[in-house]
Amino acid sequence: MPKIKTLRSASKRFKKTASGLFKRKKANLRHILTKKNTNYKRCLRKKIILSLSDYKKVLLFLPYL
């Protein structure tokens, strides 16, 4: 049986927490930032826990985490 490959783009985007869930960054913080509010941009810097519907897909991408 060959080894299962890890999807490298997913391994860079998701980090596993101690409880076994995955964290990810929020979107909309790359460009066109001058018209966005400072409070809004500060909230975008925080990490968010992945939803359970996406959790099953990420488990397929990252078999060894």
From Swiss-Prot:
GO terms for biological process: translation. Pfam families: Ribosomal_L35p (PF01632). One of its GO terms (molecular function) is structural constituent of ribosome. InterPro entries: Ribosomal_bL35, Ribosomal_bL35-like, Ribosomal_bL35_CS, Ribosomal_bL35_sf. Keywords: Ribonucleoprotein, Ribosomal protein. Gene3D superfamilies: 4.10.410.60. PROSITE patterns: RIBOSOMAL_L35. The keyword Plastid does not apply. HAMAP family: Ribosomal_bL35. Belongs to the bacterial ribosomal protein bL35 family. This is Large ribosomal subunit protein bL35. It comes from Buchnera aphidicola subsp. Cinara cedri (strain Cc). The gene is rpmI.
